[in-house]
C-alpha cells in the first residue's frame, strides 16, 4: 500500500496537481531555512502571509483561509468558509450553524455536535476535557483567519485526534476599524447583523463584536436564534510580554427537525420527523454559554518564547428530545504552558516546542420525561467528571538547507467518572447504581519531513499515531449497558501520509496529500430503537476491531487569464480569471469484521468535488459561479443496503468592494437547480431515518461598511 502511495506522490511531484489559494494572491513563498535563531511570531497579531509561512512548516496536509475568504459569503457556518478545502467534509444539519464535520473519516459517528477534530481558539484547545465540542458558540465574523491541520498533524498544539485540528484566530483591537457594520439577509427567514469596534490606545487594544442571527429554516420545526458577544482586551508590557483576556457569551435557541426516511425525503424534503414535531415532545436545543480566557506570551530571549493560557467555560443546556428532556450544567476549565525555542542546534536551524496541558470538566447531567418539551419526572441524575493531562513535544531540525526532519510525541492520561445520584431507577424502585470510573494512558509518537524541492515547492510526509478515549456522552449514552464505563476502549490510529504543495509562478498552485490510516477500536454510533416499533432512536456506541481509512486530498488554483479587460478595452490592467477546485477521495472500510466483513463504513462519499471559476476586476467587482458534486451516493448503514443519492448542485457568488468608502456588498445563490439531496446523515438508524435534507434553492446578500 505504501509503495502505491509513494508512486502517486512521485507522479504528483513530476506533474503537479493543485491547491487552494486566495484569489489573485501572490505565489506562496516557502519559509527559508536560516541558521540564525528567529523569534516565533505571535499568532494573534501575525499578518496572514506570515501565518501561511508558519503553517507550511508542518509535514502534512494544512490550509489557511484568511479574512477575505470568510467575509465574501454568508459565513453562517464552516461549510460557507471551508468549502474549497480538500479533505474537509462539512455538512450543515438543518441550515445554519450546527454541522457534521469529518476530516479523514473522523467523527463518522457524529449525528450531532463535534468529535474527532480538535477545536482550537487562538492556538489553545476549546471545548470539554473529553474532546467534545461544537462550533455554534463561535462567530466567524469575529475571526480573522482559520487554520486547518488535517489528520494527525496538530502536534504543535498538542493535538491527538484522527481528524486533526481547526484553529480559529480571533480579532483583536489591531485588526478592526473603529466601526464595522455588516448586515445579511436571505431565504428561509435568514437575518444576520454584526456590529464590531476595535481600537489601539498606546499599549492597550480592545475589540468588541456583537452578533444577532435568526433563521426560520427551510424545513418545518427548524427555526433558530443566536446572540453572540465576543470581546478581547490586550496589554503590551515593556520588554514584549503581552497579556490578553477574551470573553464570550452566547444565547442559542434552536428547534430540531430530525431525520427523514427515503420516501419522506422524496415526497417532501421540507417536512420534519413527526416525532420531533409532536407537540408532546417539541425537540429543541437551547443553551447559555460563557467563556473567559487569559493568555500571557513572554519572550524569554530573541529565540525563546513562553506562552501560558487558561480558560473557564460554563454551559446551561435545556435539550428536549423524544426519549427525554436533558438538563445539563457543564463547567470546563483548562490551563496550558507552552515553551518554544528557535535557537540553532549544532549550527543547524531548529525549533523545539514543548507543552503541558490540563483539562477538567464537571457536569450535572439530569434527564426527565418529556411533557410538551418541559421536564417532568426525573429519570437520571449523574455527576460526570472528565480529566485530561497531556505532555507533548515536537522538534523541527533543518538537516540541510532544503530538508527538515520532524520528530515528536504526546503522552496523555485521561479519566472518566460517573457518580450516580439517582439510584432508585430500576423496576419496583430497585437500586441501579451506575457509578463507575475508568482511565486511559497513552503515548503517541510522530515523525516526518519537509523537503523544499524548489523555491516554491515542497514534498512532505509523516508517520503519526493518534489516541482518542471515548467521550463522556458515549460512555453514558442511554443505549449503553448500565454500570460499566469500561465497555468502550480508546480509539487508536496509525497514519501514513505523503504529499506535495507549492506553486509555479503565479499561474499554478497545488496541494496534494495521500494517506493511509490503520485504526483499532474505532468508535461507531449505532442508533437503536429502545423498544420494538419506537418512533425514535437512542445512541449506542461500540468499538470496531479493525478499520482502514485511505484517501486523496487534492486542491488546485489555476490562473487562466489576466489583464483581459485591458486587452479588450474595458478597463485597466489587474483583472484575473482563476479556477479553483477541491477534490476528495475517501475509502473508509471495515477490516474483516465479524458482522460486516469488509463493508464500507457509513457516513461519507467516495468522491466529492467542489470547484469555482472566479473573475476579479480591478474596479473591485468579482463574480464566481461554483459547482459541487457527489457523483455516487454513499452508504448510511453498516449493512451497506441503504445509501444517499448522487447529486450535483450549482451556485454563484458576486460582490463589489469600493475601497475609498471601505464599503463591500455580496450576493449569493445556492442550489440554483433546486435539487433535493441529503446534506447530513444519521448513520445506522434502526428506524431507517437516515437523511437530513439540504436546503432548496436559496439567495443571500450582505452589506459591510468599515470606518477606520
Model-derived features with residue positions:
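Short, acidic, small-residue-rich periplasmic hinge/interaction motif at the N-terminus
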Residues: 21-71, 299
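Extracytoplasmic beta-strand/coil segments of soluble accessory domains associated
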Residues: 47, 51-52, 59-62, 79-124, ...
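Short acidic/polar hinge/loop motifs at secondary-structure boundaries
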Residues: 108, 117, 124-150
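Transmembrane beta-barrel wall of Gram-negative outer-membrane proteins
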Residues: 178-180, 185-214, 219-257, 284-295, ...
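Membrane-embedded beta-barrel scaffold of Gram-negative outer-membrane proteins
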Residues: 195, 305-318, 452, 458-468, ...
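Conserved C-terminal beta-signal and adjacent last beta-strands/turns
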Residues: 236, 395, 461, 494-496, ...
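Structural signature of Gram-negative outer-membrane beta-barrels, strongest in the C-terminal barrel
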Residues: 248, 345-359, 382-519, 614
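Gram-negative outer-membrane beta-barrel transporters
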Residues: 413, 511-519, 536-637, 704-706
